[in-house]
Each structure stands twice: as C-alpha cells, then as structure tokens.
Amino acid sequence: GVRDGYIAQPHNCVYHCFPGSGGCDTLCKENGATQGSSCFILGRGTACWCKDLPDRVGVIVDGEKCH
C-alpha cells in the first residue's frame, strides 16, 4: 500500500531541504511517491513530506530520536 509521511533516512532522520526548491518533489518521486514538498517540523527543522509513498519506504516514527 501507500501512505503520506515524512520520508526517513536510516535511523529515523529526516531529509532536510530548502523551502521552494524542487528537491523534495524529486526525492519523493524517485522513491515511488506521487509528489513531495517541504514542511517544517518542530524540533527537526525543514523536512520532506511525501504523498502516496510506498510502504516499503521508511517514514519518520513519532517520538523516536534521530540517531
């Protein structure tokens, strides 16, 4: 299946990006999502949000620190 979420690097770390750049859209589409955008997460900074991301691709788990 698919779901929306903040795409994760290994160890529950976000992909940082610059608002207004196409980086998140490209990253998300390369991983099978339909689109991507940058969103601000409190305590983590700007991160990539993907729409319709396949289940096989990791997303950020709430409450777990980047390590």
Curated annotation (Swiss-Prot):
Cystine pairs: 13-66, 17-39, 24-48, 28-50
GO cellular component: extracellular region
Tissue: Expressed by the venom gland.
Gene3D superfamilies referenced in this protein's UniProt entry, alphabetically: Knottin, scorpion toxin-like (3.30.30.10)
Keyword Transmembrane helix carried by entry: no
Cellular location(s): Secreted
Key word Secreted present: yes
Location, primary (coarse class): secreted
One GO process term, biological-process aspect: defense response
A GO term for molecular function: sodium channel inhibitor activity
Keywords: Disulfide bond, Ion channel impairing toxin, Neurotoxin, Secreted, Toxin, Voltage-gated sodium channel impairing toxin
Ranges of residues in domain LCN-type CS-alpha/beta: 3-67
InterPro entries: LCN-type_CS_alpha_beta_dom, Scorpion_toxin-like, Scorpion_toxin-like_sf, Scorpion_toxinL/defensin
Membership in a protein family: Belongs to the long (4 C-C) scorpion toxin superfamily. Sodium channel inhibitor family. Alpha subfamily.
Domain notes: Has the structural arrangement of an alpha-helix connected to antiparallel beta-sheets by disulfide bonds (CS-alpha/beta).
Protein name: Neurotoxin Os3
Native species: Orthochirus scrobiculosus
Species lineage: Eukaryota, Metazoa, Ecdysozoa, Arthropoda, Chelicerata
